[in-house]
């Protein structure tokens, strides 16, 4: 299967951001991509740098304008697309939601982000209610997709549950970067850790991983912080964590990567982690901390 990934530097103009994304989707589809994954909250700026009630106006329903627009494109091109949207579920109830569009433009399923951060410049708890759909893979014409979002990528439990439910791919739309006050050495440690933990999920579950990050500098509209330099480095790994693609740290980019999903069977025969799990001994994993 051929997978397309797009990392983009967004501005405040949603119409322009969407237009540029859709042009890149067309390009990757023409290069043979069957599945195309976009970055987290891809329609606009990463608005969670500040707490502002007016920004809830950016949320949309699902189905809604984005699923209609990108759905028409999926239908035209015959590709599966993974969107990442600010969902308005009901009055006063909002989620950070990934939506999978089938080749015919229909909604194959959605995933609501489960782990919600609350850190300087990442004030997501102000905007998003934690997901309530669980860790459920989404069946599509290109395979069973284990969709997770950004902060979820640091939790091996999420990847494992997707794998145990038959996911054939692990997919992470992402918005992550460094602060201006971080030293170059610290910035590199963070990037390395981000890639390593997800490559570890690939190894531990013998599944390909697709991580798509945004790229470029976005200022903090409140001026409380110095903004975020999103570090790009969108990447794809194989079932043993091997890097198949690693995009630029500073530039917009896209790529088409070929994955062999049948290789999972072979690798799991070599490394039978699922066979050897001691499920009789893991009960305490559900506790916050074992005192």
Spans of features found by a protein language model:
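Active-site-proximal beta-strand elements of phosphoester/diester hydrolases
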Residues: 1-12, 17, 97, 110-113, ...
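Conserved hydrophobic/aromatic positions in well-ordered beta-strands
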Residues: 4, 99-101, 235, 255
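Cys-nucleophile CN-hydrolase/nitrilase-fold catalytic domain and related Cys-dependent amidase chemistry
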Residues: 14, 22-103, 108-110, 176-207
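CN hydrolase (nitrilase-like) catalytic-core segments centered on the catalytic cysteine
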Residues: 59-82, 150-254
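Residue-level detector of high-confidence beta-strand sites
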Residues: 97, 110-112, 233, 246, ...
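A short, polar/charged loop-to-alpha-helix boundary motif
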Residues: 113-127, 251-268
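Active-site glycine-rich loop that binds ribose-phosphate moieties when present
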Residues: 121-136, 153-155
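Cysteine/selenocysteine-centered motifs that mediate thiol-based redox chemistry or coordinate metal-sulfur cofactors
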Residues: 135-165, 174, 264-291
């Amino acid at each position: 299967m051929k997978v397309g990934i797009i990392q983009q530097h967004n501005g405040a103009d949603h119409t322009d951001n969407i237009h540029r994304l859709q042009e890149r989707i067309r390009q990757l589809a023409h290069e043979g991509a069957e599945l195309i994954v976009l970055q987290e909250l891809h329609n606009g700026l990463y608005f969670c740098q500040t707490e502002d009630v007016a920004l809830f106006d950016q949320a949309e329903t699902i189905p809604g304008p984005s699923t209609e627009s990108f759905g028409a494109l999926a239908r035209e091109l015959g590709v599966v697309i993974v969107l990442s949207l600010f969902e308005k579920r009901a009055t006063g109830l909002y989620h950070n939601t990934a939506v999978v569009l089938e080749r015919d433009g229909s909604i194959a399923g959605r995933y609501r982000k489960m782990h919600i951060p609350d850190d300087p410049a990442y004030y997501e708890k102000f905007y998003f209610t934690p997901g309530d759909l669980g860790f459920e893979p989404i069946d599509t014409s290109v395979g069973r997709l284990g969709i997770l979002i950004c902060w979820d990528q640091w939790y091996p439990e999420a990847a494992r549950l997707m794998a145990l439910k038959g996911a054939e791919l692990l997919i992470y739309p992402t918005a992550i970067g460094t602060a201006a006050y971080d030293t170059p050495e610290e910035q590199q440690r963070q990037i390395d850790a981000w890639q390593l933990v997800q490559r570890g999920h690939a190894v531990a579950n013998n599944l390909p991983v697709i991580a798509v990050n945004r790229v470029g500098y976005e200022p903090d509209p409140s001026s409380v912080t110095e903004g975020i330099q999103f570090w790009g480095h969108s990447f794809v790994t194989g079932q043993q964590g091997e890097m198949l693609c690693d995009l630029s740290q500073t530039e917009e980019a896209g790529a088409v990567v070929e994955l062999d999903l049948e290789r999972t069977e072979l690798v799991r025969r070599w490394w039978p982690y699922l066979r050897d799990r001691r499920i009789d001994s893991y009960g305490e994993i559900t506790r916050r901390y074992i005192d």
